[in-house]
Amino acid sequence: MSTIYLVRHGQASFGAANYDQLSAKGEQQAQVVGDFFKQTLKHPPLVVAGSMQRHQQTAQLALSKSFHDAPIQTESAWNEFDHQHVFSQYEPRFNQPELLKQDVELVANPRAYLGKIFDGAIDRWIGAQYDHEYHETWLGFQTRVETALQTLCEHLDATQQRQAVVFSSGGVISVAVGKVLGLHAKQIFALNWSITNASITTLRWVDGRLQLLSFNEHHYLKAHDAELLTWI
């Protein structure tokens, strides 16, 4: 039996020229999740991270607070889908993140505003009608993540490793949970919108089957500082 901890990266730099880097708050979130692992894990886990900068930074900062010597196994299969490309196919302003950020700052409810764009963009992507317009189709992304998860489980069996921590993104974590629970695409992305930065979703791999133990844990962030709860 093995336990897999799926960690969403800390807050990235929304609206900046380079989204793929942690904000100052994101760096703090990563350190807090590292403190949590130091308190709860008795032995160094297998550590895996996507190759995106926000994944690597979150992993490095978390390990600096917990298991300093644990190597990070980098695997691009755990990377998020290209959200800027997917969203810009629906809303061209996503090609100019600084303009989108200005728009968001002007609305009364930024989360609802972005949620509407998110829902429309995802509906278009998962509908398959426009697959030829995307770098990676929804089915391609889903298959990539499910394969990465299965490969990890097989590796845990082969090495008899009891614990693994994977630093990734909300879309990836949603697909993994969807695989375990048998969810369809719309349900999967409903989960995605609720996952907080630096949260932990826990799976158990036992007897060739995956079980969901917890989803979107973030109590350690709230206990440290309620201002650390972010979704964007």
Feature map (PLM): residue ranges:
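Conserved beta-strand termini and adjacent loop/short-helix elements that scaffold enzyme active sites
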Residues: 7, 75-77, 215
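Generic beta-sheet signal
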Residues: 4, 45, 162-168
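Loop-to-helix element that buttresses phosphate recognition and phosphoryl-transfer chemistry
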Residues: 3-6, 10-62, 137-145
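Acidic, low-complexity terminal tails and accessory targeting/binding regions
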Residues: 2, 68, 79-109, 139, ...
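Short glycine/proline- and acidic residue-enriched helix-loop micro-motifs
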Residues: 100-140
